């Protein structure tokens, strides 16, 4: 919404056992002039529920493509997923394009082949950057990332913990509240190696350890160190994976928000997980 305000926003409201799963995001999307809220049971059509593969989350948009004249589907998949295997180890997507097609991902390449390109413009941006761009909306309670407590944030899960950590890094006015996260399940998560989205915790420890509770720092201080600011920079080369027809306009707009990684920063990112 902040970087590409002209884009149509398609959001699925989930139906489970005949009932709508509560989410604060429903009212937010309905209030947007370019918002499309679609109710569907596709995520819970089987038992156990869940996406059968990640492209299923875009199915509604694909079905709407003709009626809405959608020429490109933008997703919000971030750097940790596109290049870092959920923050565990660097994945050379550029090299993978030799066997996964021009996008470096066989699903995205398939979408491109059938004429409805699928691309994440924040695929070269960490969650630090995406939250930084969304901060004005977050302050207006216009961003939903956890729905476990009556459709809103539970402030107990690992996703909520990561959001608290990220905002501590990018928002100097933010006062984090850590008490609800000091639990055996969170401790176990922090101790597990390799660590899910470990680069987020490593960078936060490197730059803001004084703002973190000791029960957290004692469990993440052994993570691989990050010496440059690559988690706070955008990887421009990620736009190599979108068709030239869209590339320049998409990249120009994201560069209005983010600084680009230097070669030194990109090279350090490539060592993550070694």
Show where each model-derived region lies.
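Nucleotide-activated chemistry modules centered on ATP-dependent adenylation/adenylyltransferase
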Residues: 2-274
């Amino acid at each position: 919404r902040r970087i590409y305000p002209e884009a149509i926003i398609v959001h699925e409201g989930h139906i489970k056992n005949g009932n709508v799963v509560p989410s604060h995001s429903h009212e937010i999307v309905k209030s947007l002039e370019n918002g499309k809220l679609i109710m569907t049971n596709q995520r819970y059509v089987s038992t156990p529920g869940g996406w059968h593969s990640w492209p299923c989350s875009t199915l509604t948009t694909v079905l709407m493509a003709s009626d809405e004249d959608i020429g490109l589907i933008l997703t919000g998949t971030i750097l940790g997923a596109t290049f870092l295997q959920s923050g565990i180890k660097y994945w050379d997507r550029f090299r993978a394009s030799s066997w996964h097609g021009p996008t470096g991902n066989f699903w995205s390449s398939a979408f491109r082949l059938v004429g409805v390109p699928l691309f994440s413009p924040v695929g070269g941006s960490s969650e630090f950057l995406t939250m930084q761009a969304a901060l004005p909306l977050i302050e207006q309670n216009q961003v939903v990332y956890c729905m476990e407590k009556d459709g809103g944030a539970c402030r107990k899960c690992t996703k909520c913990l990561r959001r608290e950590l990220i905002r501590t890094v990018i928002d100097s006015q933010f006062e984090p509240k850590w008490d609800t996260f000091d639990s055996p399940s969170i401790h176990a998560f922090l101790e597990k190696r390799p660590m899910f989205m470990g680069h987020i915790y490593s960078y936060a420890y490197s730059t803001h350890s004084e703002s973190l509770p000791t029960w957290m720092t004692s469990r993440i201080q052994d993570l691989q160190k990050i010496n440059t600011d690559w988690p706070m920079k955008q990887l421009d080369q990620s736009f190599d994976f979108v068709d030239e027809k869209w590339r320049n306009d998409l990249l120009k707009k994201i560069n209005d928000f983010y600084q680009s990684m230097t070669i030194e920063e990109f090279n350090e990112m490539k060592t993550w997980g070694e």
